[in-house]
Design a protein with these regions (language model features):
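Conserved interdomain hinge at the start of the Helicase C-terminal
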Residues: 77, 83-84, 138-173, 177
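SF2 helicase catalytic motif II
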Residues: 37-40, 50-85
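SF2 helicase motor core recognition
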Residues: 42, 220-236, 251-259
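C-terminal helicase lobe and adjacent C-terminal extensions/tails of nucleic-acid helicase motors
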Residues: 86, 153, 160-162, 173, ...
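Inter-Walker segment of RecA-like/P-loop motor cores
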Residues: 1-44
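Conserved helicase motor
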Residues: 2-16, 170-173, 191-208, 223-229
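Conserved two-lobed SF2 helicase motor
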Residues: 26-46, 213-229, 241
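Interdomain hinge/linker at the junction between the two RecA-like core domains of SF2 helicases
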Residues: 99-160
Length: 454
């Protein structure tokens, strides 16, 4: 059973949808495919509907894909919860990642009272022990670690020296700007933009187009945000990655010569845009940690286990708080009062549930007129035609998140149905090339705050 927001149930009859809804509440199924958001927010919830599934996690095996993406500011409560599942509920945990964080290493620092890293008490066992000679077979790319320092236009010229490429940047604003620069210089139909300026259905269709071009040997030039770095099976001869953390660089490299069919290694370039401001938050910490070890990586070539551990030690030493919302303290308390909390069952589940948000979303979701489905759905909303369950499911796939300032900028182009559904009425502000587009109103649509695409 699949339990996540991208499920397309439009072809399912109502009775099947109702049955599946019950299954998603209790996870009474032998195999569940879900997301970190669903999993962890259920574990930390105090609401009956979300907690109803927890007993089925006992005596199970939980597989986490891309475990390096656990948010640092929530690591303490998340790791403590996972250890509790393992110790008390006999749940086996399998962490899948090319860059395993040091979740089992003690990073205590006496000068950081109350902000220390919680590590697993038992060491993580490697399913496949590291063997340099064995793993050499997976060295499919050559890393160019010394960052290229280029303006947007210089980067565009650099990219167009390749028939096919994937360029990954840190923000939607950068993606749109580089795409515009490429469009000025290149008029081919194989140039594709990907970002969360586009609704999920739009992204899905673009990915299908990219995969078909790659499969048939046609050229394809892609400028994208980080959305292609995990769970997207693409294979390019050359990849450019804006400066980020080592984990992100290696994720991007996984989209280069992925299937190992090239007679020579693929090429991975790292670059910094000269117009780019110093990043804040998680992205800034990650960039700083990578820059500190560029010389070491140049010597290594392909990152080794020691390089990955060095990176995470550096990165985690810069993180200010691994329990930024105080969730772990609400549930487990300090060492001094932990036993008393357990004896008296004094746990503040309600506040912990309110504070634990796997993804902080400060955007407004706007339904956009993408394709026939988007236009028809907006027409239904405008004509006050009652929406069916399938329509509500489709709302998610046709929505884009925008920030308050951009919501205000779009002004009268966004209307509400009165029940909380916002929709874009002016089609000129949704482009088939880049999605939401308000460049004509002289407004930058999005900003970078913590390294996650926004």
């Amino acid at each position: 059973m699949e339990h996540h927001s991208d499920i397309d149930v439009r072809e399912q009859p109502d009775e099947v949808q109702e049955y599946n809804k019950l299954l998603t509440e209790n996870w009474d199924f032998p195999l569940i495919i879900t997301t970190n958001v669903q999993f962890f927010e259920s574990l930390f919830s105090n609401r009956v509907a979300r907690c109803r599934k927890l007993h089925n996690i006992c005596n199970s095996v939980v597989v986490f894909d891309e475990a390096q993406m656990f948010p640092p500011e929530l690591l303490n409560p998340m790791l403590q919860m996972l250890q509790s599942l393992n110790y008390s509920f006999r749940t086996e945990l399998l962490l899948c990642t090319a860059t395993l964080p040091i979740f089992d290493k003690d990073l205590s620092n006496k000068n950081r009272d109350g902000q220390n890293f919680f590590c697993f008490e038992e060491p993580i066992e490697e399913v496949v022990p590291y063997d340099a000679e064995l793993f050499a077979a997976f060295d499919k790319v050559t890393y160019h670690w010394s960052p290229l320092k280029l303006s947007t236009d210089e980067l565009a010229e650099h990219l167009l020296q390749n028939d096919s490429f994937l360029c990954i940047v840190n923000s939607r604003k950068d993606a749109a700007r580089i795409y515009a620069s490429l469009k000025e210089r290149y008029k081919g139909d194989d140039l594709i933009h990907l970002s969360r300026r586009m609704c999920a259905l739009h992204i899905q269709n673009r990915l299908k187009e990219i995969k078909e071009r790659l499969r048939s040997g046609q050229s394809v030039k892609v400028i994208s945000t980080q959305l292609v770095e995990a769970g997207v099976d693409l294979d390019f001869p050359v990849v450019y990655r804006a400066m980020a953390g080592l984990d992100s660089i290696m994720q991007a490299a996984g989209r280069c010569n992925r299937e190992g069919r090239m007679p020579v290694p693929g090429k991975v370039y790292i670059f910094r845009l000269t117009e780019e401001r110093n990043a804040n938050g998680e992205l800034g910490l990650a960039q700083g940690s990578l820059e500190d070890m560029v010389d070491q990586l140049v010597r290594s070539g392909t990152p080794q286990q020691a390089d990955i551990e060095h990176y995470y030690r550096s990165f985690y030493s810069k993180v200010r708080n691994f329990d930024a919302k105080g969730v772990a303290k609400l549930l487990w308390g300090d060492e001094d009062d932990q036993k008393e909390r357990i004896r008296s069952l004094r746990f503040d589940y309600e506040k912990a549930s309110d504070q634990f948000k796997y993804i902080e979303d400060h955007t407004k979701q706007i339904v956009v007129p993408y394709g026939k489905e988007g236009k028809e759905l907006i027409e239904k909303i405008q004509r006050n035609i009652p929406l069916r369950r399938n329509d509500y499911r489709l709302l998610h796939r046709l929505s884009v998140g925008i920030y308050e300032k951009d919501y205000l900028t779009l002004g009268k182009s966004i209307l509400s149905d009165g029940d909380g559904i916002l929709y874009l009425t002016d089609e000129q502000y949704y482009s088939n090339d880049i999605g939401i587009d308000i460049a004509n109103m002289n407004s930058e649509l999005l900003i970078v705050s913590d390294g996650r695409e926004q």
